[in-house]
Amino acid sequence: MTKIKICGITRLSDALESCRAGADALGFNFSSLSPRAITPERAKEIIEKLPPFVASTGIFVDQSPEEINAICRFCKLQIAQLHSEQYSPEDARAITEAKVIKVFRPEENFAVEEVFAFAEKSGINAFLFDAYRPDMAGGTGETIRASLATRIFNALGDSCYPILAGGLNESNIGEAIRSLQPYGVDTASGVECEPGIKDPVKIKAFIQAVRKTVF
């Protein structure tokens, strides 16, 4: 069954609505440049009220491994998502307070060998692929070109746990899952009425669309 992460959570009501609808994980963005930015203090308040079996994920863009470990420990995050090209395999190995997901934002000439090399050097086995945009790390509402995504996911096969992100919504998620068969999918803008404010109807529709898709 395809795993689902609802990202860019800023309000408790949105977090609980996502959980009730069947989300497997929630994402909290700690980048001050994001329109969905949240403080560790506020994230901790929300995470403490989550039901069991929902993984809390921190999105990090410019923090050091030491800062990431401290935030993960403080908030009791289960996953640290490294959403920047600046993070090296050594950085990933230095994060010990949570499981790590490394993000790639591939352009057309992306070499899949980069993923294999990062996995070998870091020891991590989960990678998220998001649409590339130079001025924004995630939550752009833009999708990865279908041919590029297909090339990447086909090459990866069962070597890791690939997660698809980038402009996913109720309308396009079914075809994306059937085509790529990702381990998980991640959406932020696809279930919002404005950045950081989720729409309960869109959340339910997105999760239902994922659950009814088989491959």
Swiss-Prot record:
EC number annotated for this UniProt entry: 5.3.1.24
Family: Belongs to the TrpF family.
Oxidoreductase among keywords: no
Source organism, top-level taxon: Bacteria
Signal peptide: none
Alphabetized InterPro entries for the sequence: Aldolase_TIM, PRAI_dom, RibuloseP-bd_barrel, TrpF_fam
GO molecular function: phosphoribosylanthranilate isomerase activity
Naturally occurring in which organism (per UniProt): Pelodictyon phaeoclathratiforme (strain DSM 5477 / BU-1)
Keyword Glycoprotein: no
Catalyzed chemical reaction(s): N-(5-phospho-beta-D-ribosyl)anthranilate = 1-(2-carboxyphenylamino)-1-deoxy-D-ribulose 5-phosphate
Gene: trpF
SUPFAM superfamilies cross-referenced by the UniProt entry: Ribulose-phoshate binding barrel (SSF51366)
UniProt keywords, alphabetically: Amino-acid biosynthesis, Aromatic amino acid biosynthesis, Isomerase, Tryptophan biosynthesis
UniProt-recorded name of the protein: N-(5'-phosphoribosyl)anthranilate isomerase
PANTHER family: N-(5'-PHOSPHORIBOSYL)ANTHRANILATE ISOMERASE
